[in-house]
UniProtKB/Swiss-Prot annotation:
GO CC annotations, alphabetized: plasma membrane
EC number of this enzyme: 2.4.1.227
CDD domains named in the record: GT28_MurG
Name assigned to this protein: UDP-N-acetylglucosamine--N-acetylmuramyl-(pentapeptide) pyrophosphoryl-undecaprenol N-acetylglucosamine transferase
GO terms for MF: UDP-N-acetyl-D-glucosamine:N-acetylmuramoyl-L-alanyl-D-glutamyl-meso-2,6-diaminopimelyl-D-alanyl-D-alanine-diphosphoundecaprenol 4-beta-N-acetylglucosaminlytransferase activity; undecaprenyldiphospho-muramoylpentapeptide beta-N-acetylglucosaminyltransferase activity
UniProt gene name: murG
Pathway linked to the protein: Cell wall biogenesis; peptidoglycan biosynthesis
Length: 363
């Protein structure tokens, strides 16, 4: 009988894309794979095309700010735990892997109630709320950065691994990327990414600076679902996508500089691909500040050029692009010195090891 694994994680693509890299590895080795996510999250549309059984459960948002919706969240979380527990009783997987996000906590607790071992993964410098709450119920947690260890009491549960990256992303073809965009090879390409949901401030800034940017560069713009600007279709040197899946590796390969939010997964991919970059972290007014922390760390190493979201304007962005181009060789060398690589093999080994470990009855 083939071993089985359940994956969970969702809310944004950053909690799903790393799972996809692992799913491909486990399917290649003959494991049965299923996924538990939120009922209406982005994870469903990302996972279902892979022909994997998807189960939606109730989940609370785990907000850190006051909202009347917070009054309902505990009930949603309890319902999610019950639904997950019943699913696990039926599926009986050997192990569960959690990538975090608000759906993960009820799934992790449901697995613990069924004595199913859980391996979690945290991408950021400091753990998100879902992983903080899940920590007592997991067997192991894999961290991207060593700096994250200080936030957890049980050091024996921690493995610093890095982040899993799809092997496909590392083998992009620059000529194919240029061909998709109908670009020429003699002009430098910039790749702009605002995350799976898009980034309004980045989109607006790129479009306001487009005339100046395209006079010197070619711009590949991943602007988010529903965020395309029809008035810019056909502008020479500019190619916009809602998001990129199969072609993302080629678009990365075609680009010399990346402009991006500072989510840990995207940042890790950018570093693994050795791309000089500009980071525009989400403001702490609308987030827990994890992207700011990620960006500051690599800015301190002289690797990342960082623009505060509140200060993002066309002239500031144009100056940052010029700064990166001027220091490109220096930045290239500093990124190479980090020796960032995909952690897929390490994490797969930990998951397999924990599949045979008894889950403790007391947290």
């Amino acid at each position: 009988m083939s071993p089985s694994i359940v994956f969970t994680g969702g809310g944004t693509a950053g909690h799903v894309t790393p799972n996809i890299a692992l799913i491909k590895e486990f399917r290649k080795e003959g494991w049965n794979v299923e996924y538990i996510g939120s009922v209406s999250g982005i994870e469903k549309e990302m996972i279902e095309p892979m022909d994997i059984p998807f189960h939606g459960v109730s989940s609370g948002k785990l907000r850190r700010y006051f909202s009347l919706k917070n009054l309902l969240d505990p009930f949603k979380i309890v319902l999610g735990i019950i639904q997950s527990s019943l699913l696990f009783y039926k599926i009986k997987p050997d192990v569960v892997f959690s990538k975090g996000g608000f759906v993960a906590f009820p799934v992790v607790v449901g697995a613990w109630l069924n004595r199913i071992p859980v391996v979690a993964h945290e991408s950021d410098m400091s753990p998100g709320l879902a992983n903080r709450l899940s920590f007592p119920f997991v067997n192991k947690i894999c961290l991207t950065f060593d700096a994250g260890k200080k936030y957890f009491k049980r050091q024996d549960k921690i493995e610093v691994t890095g982040t899993q990256i799809s092997s496909q992303l590392l083998t992009g073809n620059p000529m194919k990327g240029l061909e998709v965009c109908r670009f020429i090879s003699s002009k430098t390409c910039l790749l702009v990414m605002g995350g799976s949901l898009g980034a309004g401030s980045i989109n607006s800034c790129i479009r306001s600076a487009l005339k100046q940017l395209t006079s010197e560069f070619q711009v590949i713009h991943l602007c988010g679902k529903g965020k395309l600007d029809s008035s810019l279709v056909g502008v020479e040197g500019y190619c916009q996508f809602e998001y990129a899946n199969e072609e993302l590796a080629d678009l990365f390969a075609a680009s010399s500089v990346v402009i991006s939010r500072a989510g840990a997964n995207s940042l890790y991919e950018i570093l693994a691909l050795g791309k000089p970059h500009i980071l525009i972290p989400i403001s702490s007014q609308v987030s827990r500040g994890d992207q700011i922390q990620n960006a500051r760390y690599f800015q301190g190493l002289g690797i990342s050029v960082v623009i505060q979201d509140e200060l993002l304007k066309a002239d500031v962005l144009l100056q940052a692009v010029q700064d990166v181009m001027r220091k490109k060789d220096e930045i290239d060398n500093k990124i190479k010195a980090l020796k960032i690589e995909s952690a897929t093999d390490k994490i797969v080994a930990i998951i397999k090891e924990q599949a045979h470990v008894q889950t403790p009855r007391i947290v």
